[in-house]
Amino acid sequence: MSSLGPLVAADETFNHQIIDTFATVSQADRSWTEKVCAMAAPRDGSVQLAFGMGKYTNRNVLDAYAGISRGREQWTVRASRRLLPDVDHLAAGPITYEVLEPLRTVRFSLAPNDVVPISFEWIFTAALPPALEQREQHRSRDGGRVDADIVRYHQIGTATGWYEVDGVRGTVDEAAVSTRDHSWGVRYMVGPPAVDVEDPARPAGVSTIVLWSPILCERQDGSRYGLHVFYQRHRFGDWQRVELQGGVEHPDGRREPFLQLLPHAEVRDDNRRLVRATLDCTMSDGSTRPLELAAVSETGFHLGAGLYFGLDGHWHGEWRGDLHVDGEYVADCTDPATARRLHQMRDNLVCVEDAVGQGVGFGNMQSIFAGAQPEIGLTEEASFL
């Protein structure tokens, strides 16, 4: 006798792709995740709103984070709840995700709460069509297990809305940039690390650069286009592996891919914050397209507060009961010890000058600079994820 998952509202749609209900995914891996992540910020970098939500069908968990970064300060609310039977309700505690128009308009909101004195609501409006990224698939070091098998699309747009900190309300107008991504599949670092398998710790001597960045650019005539970079470089002695995707994105859906990218970055060694960089890009026709970018301010939400790479012994998708809500205020995220707790990857608002495209852009640069990289002054001793 076969068993089926419970019926949910989505089962009324004509979108089934496996022989089961929408309460079930096609495999039993506990790391299966569907996730959204978004940011919004005015171009002056005075403040940034952050949002993330994950659905872990095989863990019966839906969790989320919402936060505000303002200069060196950061406020975060995290929530986790039992997924079943309310699998279609995309909310956990005070945090809510709502699709207003598919692939076009989304609302991200944080209601007033008892954790930290912040709340917000912003509506993402697409400036460009969503862009499906290449399938991201990584194996364990021994090659025996697929650690990550993810499909992701990102979208570049603008934001309108409001935010409140300590009872003082500010507005987000349509000049603010907003980026979002939506992914699903088997992810790394879901749930506490397994204790009965080989230690996956990073080998000494390995250096890594990861850059992921969607940018909204505008020319003097008001026309818009996007830039997207997803660059990963792993180096060990004379061995090196580079993965690259991205390019120029046009409003009509056309995409001009990057063939090669060479980053030249200035990064603080003590907290691994990206200050500025030149990305020497080569297009598929062989032409060069250098991109000059710089962090707009100290503002930038540390994603570790949303449980990326874990936080204080807790992880994405971890069972916390029927409903659990927590969070914290951090006074200075640039402090090296604090940066290690929150990890270095963050939603860093950057300004980009694209001389070839004749545009200036603003967007989100997530970066990791791990290991010793003496060519840019980074030491092994100061390295952390």
Role assignments for model-derived ranges:
Residues 1-385:
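Structured soluble/peripheral alpha/beta segments that form catalytic or ligand/cofactor-binding pockets
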